[in-house]
């Protein structure tokens, strides 16, 4: 068996970190994969913690604003082990300080071009679900950070070809709302209140995915690329109305779903325009990933209740009071 070298972007972030976790879990002996973890600063606490947990992982210092330099650094490190870069996991930051619409698109396209130029065999792009596997190819939605991902998807499809054996094989993973973005504290209370304002108690459901499971699917692609080649699939592990979400919180943690005043939730969607557009889209259309199909691929995919119990930062004290709020 030839070991595959996988370049993982966003290695110290949620998705990249989950991909590394899943690859390491799938390859405990170290015979299948050699992992190159891209980080802006190799001496950052997060990067140092990563290699402390996984000594086999090799850090590559670089960023997606200079993809040629990133690949040069990666090839030097991969060359030490006489292994070409076989696969790339691509994820870009889409919201936050300094992040722009054009910047995300530029990074995503540049990484595709760089991967092709450097002979990468399989490219996995983490995008976003936009209303079903087929509809996502057509729908950009009104949400800017969904639109960027469709542009990058289209570029990947057009540049690499639609048939296996073309310039570079690829798989697109389209996750829905991240369970992991729910954390103790006021931001989550505001977000959930805004959701409830738009979705009602039981009027409209919303799909959720644990970041852990995004990593599992990426690892499955790298392990069995022929099965997933030239496919684009939505990833969701649960679908809940707000009433069902509240019950999941109560069962898993012993206390109610964290909410605040309805007016505060309305103010959030008014002030944070893009967030308001996204929540409005959740109410009018929403995610439509095929949960049953994905659970056949990955029977251990987490439900919201399971995630709250095993992966979240939510917990209860002896008296049932919330810790960490």
Describe these PLM feature segments.
Residues 1-5, 25-32, 52-53, 80-81, ...:
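Eukaryotic N-terminal low-complexity, Ser/Thr- and Lys/Arg-rich leader segments
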Residues 34-118:
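NAD(P)H-binding glycine-rich loop region in Rossmannoid oxidoreductase-like domains
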């Amino acid at each position: 068996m030839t070991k595959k070298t996988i370049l993982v972007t966003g290695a110290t972030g949620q998705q990249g970190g989950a991909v590394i976790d899943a690859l390491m879990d799938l390859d405990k002996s170290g015979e299948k994969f050699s992992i190159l973890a891209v980080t802006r600063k190799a001496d950052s606490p997060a990067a140092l913690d990563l290699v402390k947990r996984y000594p086999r992982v090799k850090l590559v210092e670089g960023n997606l604003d200079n993809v040629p330099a990133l690949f040069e650094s990666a090839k030097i490190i991969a060359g030490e082990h006489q292994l070409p870069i076989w696969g790339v996991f691509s994820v870009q930051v889409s919201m936050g300080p300094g992040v722009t619409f054009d910047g995300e698109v530029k990074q995503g396209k540049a990484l595709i071009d760089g991967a092709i130029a450097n002979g990468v065999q399989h490219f996995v792009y983490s995008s976003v679900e936009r209303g079903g596997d087929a509809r996502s190819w057509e729908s950009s939605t009104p949400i800017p950070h969904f639109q960027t991902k469709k542009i990058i998807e289209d570029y990947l499809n057009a540049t690499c070809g639609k048939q296996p054996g073309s310039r570079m094989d690829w798989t697109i993973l389209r996750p829905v709302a991240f369970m992991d973005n729910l954390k103790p504290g006021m931001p989550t209370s505001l977000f959930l209140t805004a959701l409830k304002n738009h979705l009602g108690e039981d009027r409209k459901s919303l799909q959720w995915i644990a970041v852990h499971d995004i990593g599992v699917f990426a690892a499955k692609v790298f392990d069995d690329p022929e099965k997933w080649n030239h496919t684009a699939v939505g990833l969701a592990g649960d679908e809940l109305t707000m009433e069902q979400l509240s019950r999941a919180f109560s069962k898993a943690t012993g206390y109610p779903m964290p909410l605040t005043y309805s007016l505060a939730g309305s103010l959030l969607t008014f002030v944070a325009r893009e967030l308001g557009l996204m929540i409005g889209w959740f109410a009018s259309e929403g995610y439509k990933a095929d949960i049953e199909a994905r659970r056949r691929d990955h029977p251990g995919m987490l439900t919201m209740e399971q995630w709250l119990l095993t992966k979240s930062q939510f917990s209860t004290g002896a008296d049932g009071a919330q810790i960490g709020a």
